[in-house]
């Protein structure tokens, strides 16, 4: 089940906490505001919520007055809408034992273009398999979503740019 408390007027909240659960038949635990984190933590615990999609600003609220066991059922915590500060990510993981996965997007990508993913289970009968691509890297917004292409350019010249420098990203979808 998913905790559905993000405002619905931005595409992020509308798409990931309303339309995704409705289309895919995922149970939703709804609450009208993401600001009342103590009440939300009670709901997570009461209904054994497994997915929480939030923003870094709202995650900060859980760090004040929410107990570790209240978020024990969560298997996936994803943030978007703003940069995830390392301090918030580390504090949340330390306090609740849950890795926070950061994503990136904009309204035009409805609303996700990149997202970090939980680490996959190792392949192979003995558990000694390998993974082709890392699914999570701290400080990044994760892998590009399937169906998108990206061109990375220098923001000043428009020329090609390598990925670990200041840059402009151009996204293109199928249409």
Describe every region a protein language model picked out.
Residues 55-56, 175:
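Beta->alpha turn/N-cap motifs
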Residues 35-38, 60, 84-85:
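Short acidic loop-to-helix transition motifs that present clustered carboxylates
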Residues 1, 9-50, 65:
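Conserved AMP-binding/adenylation subdomain of ANL enzymes
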Residues 1-4, 169-170:
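Short, well-ordered beta-strand segments
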Residues 6-10, 156, 174-175:
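AMP-binding (ANL) adenylation modules
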Residues 144-172:
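Conserved beta-loop-beta connector loops within the AMP-binding
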């Amino acid at each position: 089940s998913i905790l559905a408390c993000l405002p619905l007027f931005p595409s992020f909240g509308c798409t990931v906490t309303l339309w995704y659960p409705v289309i895919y038949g995922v149970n939703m635990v709804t609450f009208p505001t993401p600001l009342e984190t103590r009440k939300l933590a009670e709901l997570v615990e009461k209904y054994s919520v497994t997915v929480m999609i939030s923003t870094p600003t709202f995650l900060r609220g859980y760090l004040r007055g929410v107990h570790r066991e209240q978020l024990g059922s969560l298997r996936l915590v994803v943030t978007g809408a703003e940069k995830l500060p390392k301090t918030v990510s580390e504090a949340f993981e330390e306090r609740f034992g849950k890795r926070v996965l950061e994503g990136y997007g904009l309204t035009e990508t409805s609303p996700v273009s990149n997202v970090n993913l939980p680490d996959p289970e190792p392949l192979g009968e003995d558990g000694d398999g390998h993974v082709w691509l890392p699914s999570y890297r701290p400080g990044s917004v994760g892998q590009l979503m399937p169906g998108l292409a990206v061109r990375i350019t220098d923001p000043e010249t428009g020329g090609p740019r390598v990925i670990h420098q200041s840059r402009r990203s151009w996204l293109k979808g199928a249409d």
